Amino acid sequence: PSGVMTPTRWIPRIRKGAPAPSSDVFSVWEGAPLLPRAVYDRAGGWGAPYFYAHEGIELAWRVWDTGHRVLYAGDLVANHPAIDPARHSYYYRLNARNRVWLAKRNLPWVLVPFYVGSWTGIQLLRSLRNRTGLGAWFGGWLAGWREKPGGRRRIKWVTVWRMTRAGRPPLV
């Protein structure tokens, strides 16, 4: 309500652009998803072990796995304080841990190293500009491999193909 521009991190597309256009997406903002209860139940609901970050990616992937699509409705407004989450070290730790968990819980095993590897590369490139949080990030990355992330429910190869055809292979 303050008139401040939407942070691009809340636009769930690789090519962010303007927030207004609606499109198929592969993650949802955890604060305001809207879907039929039957689809939510078929998708397995929220990924409770995450605690912070990536539950929305998992829910979106699993909705795609039910044969449905996930739509970002750019014309809807959800108000939330635009506070930089990187102000806390747990942001880095949980993002890294949960990326690994997301892959371990949902992807066919052969894709897990590609997904985690691509996000590791992205984080290393980001750290060239700003090393803040890199230690916490690697701590979370290691925890993701060491800890059990809860139940595994692999998405089907046909879902990987549908997501790829829709513009977002589950590798990035």
Question: Which ranges hold each PLM region?
Answer:
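Acidic/His-rich active-site region of diverse nucleotide-sugar glycosyltransferases
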Residues: 1-45, 49-52
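Active-site donor/metal-binding and catalytic loop motifs
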Residues: 60, 66-90, 101-102
